[in-house]
């Protein structure tokens, strides 16, 4: 896939600093270090657009990336593991909840799971919240390249047990990029 025109716009720690241009937004949600930033980089064709790290909890604000001047990809802080004081973790939680509940320009979310780990309680809580509020989302199963074929199938089968069809993704091979874009563009065209 060729690179899209994509640019970092703002890193927001408060709702009043979110972009105000009313472009539609696609949110990337998941545990810390699950591959949200790597997925954004793969989707845009820019290896260093979104900062990636092997250290969980590096994304500590909501990061907005404008794509082709038409919409935003939004990288949210990961939930779960992060070496930060409890007060910061609570601030992230409040910020994320506010974004998901009140952001009118949020049109679609990618709920990202590590295929090796499957569903954790906080993932299930988020899935239930999205279902309850009628928010459209796609479950993306990352890190498939770290598993052999039978391990991949076992991980994907475990994810399917919650009644969703995960879309496998690999940052190394690009597996799943086209299908994820198809889901995003279908949603954007419908709204």
UniProtKB/Swiss-Prot annotation:
Cofactor: Mg(2+)
Keywords (A to Z) from UniProt: Cell cycle, Cell division, GTP-binding, Magnesium, Metal-binding, Nucleotide-binding, Septation
GO process terms (BP): division septum assembly
Residues that coordinate or bind Mg(2+): 37, 59
Entry-linked PROSITE patterns: G_ENGB
Residue ranges of every copy of the EngB-type G domain listed in the record: 22-190
Binding, GTP: 30-37, 57-61, 75-78, 142-145, 169-171
UniProt keyword annotation of Endoplasmic reticulum present: no
Taxonomic superkingdom: Bacteria
Molecular functions per Gene Ontology: GTP binding; metal ion binding
Xref: Pfam families: MMR_HSR1
NCBIfam families attached to this UniProt entry: GTPase_YsxC (TIGR03598), small_GTP (TIGR00231)
Family of the protein in this entry: Belongs to the TRAFAC class TrmE-Era-EngA-EngB-Septin-like GTPase superfamily. EngB GTPase family.
HAMAP family, alphabetized: GTPase_EngB
Functional note: Necessary for normal cell division and for the maintenance of normal septation.
Protein name (database record): Probable GTP-binding protein EngB
Organism of this sequence: Solibacter usitatus (strain Ellin6076)
